[in-house]
Curated annotation (Swiss-Prot):
Protein known as: tRNA modification GTPase MnmE
Binding site for (6S)-5-formyl-5,6,7,8-tetrahydrofolate: 20, 76, 116, 428
Residues at which K(+) binds: 222, 241, 243, 246
Classification of source organism: Bacteria, Pseudomonadati, Pseudomonadota, Alphaproteobacteria, Rhodobacterales
EC number: 3.6.-.-
Gene name as annotated: mnmE
Amino acid sequence: MDTIYALASARGKAGVAVLRLSGPRSHEAVQAFGVLLPPLRHAALRRLTWNDEVLDEALVLLFGAGASFTGETSAELHLHGSPAAVSSVLRVLSGLPGLRAAEAGEFTRRALENGRLDLAQVEGLADLIDAETEAQRRQAMRVFSGAIGERAERWRADLIRAAALLEATIDFADEDVPVDVTPEVLTLIDGLLADLRREVDGSRIAERIRDGFEVAIVGAPNAGKSTLLNALARREAAITSEIAGTTRDVIEVRMDLDGLPVTFLDTAGLRDTSDLVESLGIERAVTRAKAADLRVFLLDDSGPLPGITVQADDLVVQGKADLRPGHGLRLSGRTGEGVPELVAAIGERLLGRTAGAGSLTRERHRLAIERAIGAMESVRAELLRGQQHTELAADDLRRAIRSLDSLVGRVDVESLLGEIFASFCIGK
């Protein structure tokens, strides 16, 4: 296997730059700089030289196979963060035999292949790197720390137990095996179904935390929507004008709201119009508003809005509070009156929804669980039809196990046989 190397820290001038190496020749590559290798997992300051020239002074860290991020023999060089110093060391590494520059994500790929991370943890690491808000960071850390894998291992153990019971009645019918294992299998299946359904119920909120919530600002033309967006963004994100219908397309502004990733949508003013371009903008506004996680209706005296109605979960705000009296939640994007209260109300609504977030943060996770649920529902139906359908139920159980493979890895035949032998003392 090749030994790979790459700059692990950000490119450009910095206090420290970290070079990472992984593979059988990583320690040998460090030694090529004329340094005395330190003990494993001990940082040591070493002078890196090449052709009698000092390239840099670096902290050197060595890791043994099985005790590194990738699971391979690895090394790290902590250099001064000079682009020239980094380039000089990379140039030497590129000329050493058996070494090559790493491809994108290759260190993490090796960690996956060597069992240091499961696939969900790899995805959690990617989400952690991309996290922009506190909620995203916390969620990504849970996944990276193995929350999905731990749950999946418990589900997997129950599935294997249920499969072992059914396979035993099929393959060892003449042996000392309980005649009817249906009640025990149904108990396992019912417990699993309850757990998995809870996870699916919470998955869409978890996906929203990862991808971000959308909050649409809806109202009639010239109601102050763009002015409100600018007040929320604290910059001129949208053009404002006294001319009704200025906003034709959806304008998006992404913000960190109480630790949640939120994209505010400034939509075209809703009204009946014969203007083709404006009508297209209104159609798009209605579509985006209906799909948004939360809608803020900015109302004035223009009456009902065409194409959309206020729902129970929507926020209704009286706009242009600086120009007209009123009661309830009122604001003025121009003066800032009521904006903090609106932000607090939006944050409260969205934070309330995150309480039900599960561990499944991606559509892939949810679809795998939904396939497993479908297979287990088939198992349940077959078992309730009678023992003559045990083989069909066993096949559905294997399908459920395969559906979870993307989360926990493959279930091999030996583990299934081991469970059978341990449970039913089959071995004569």
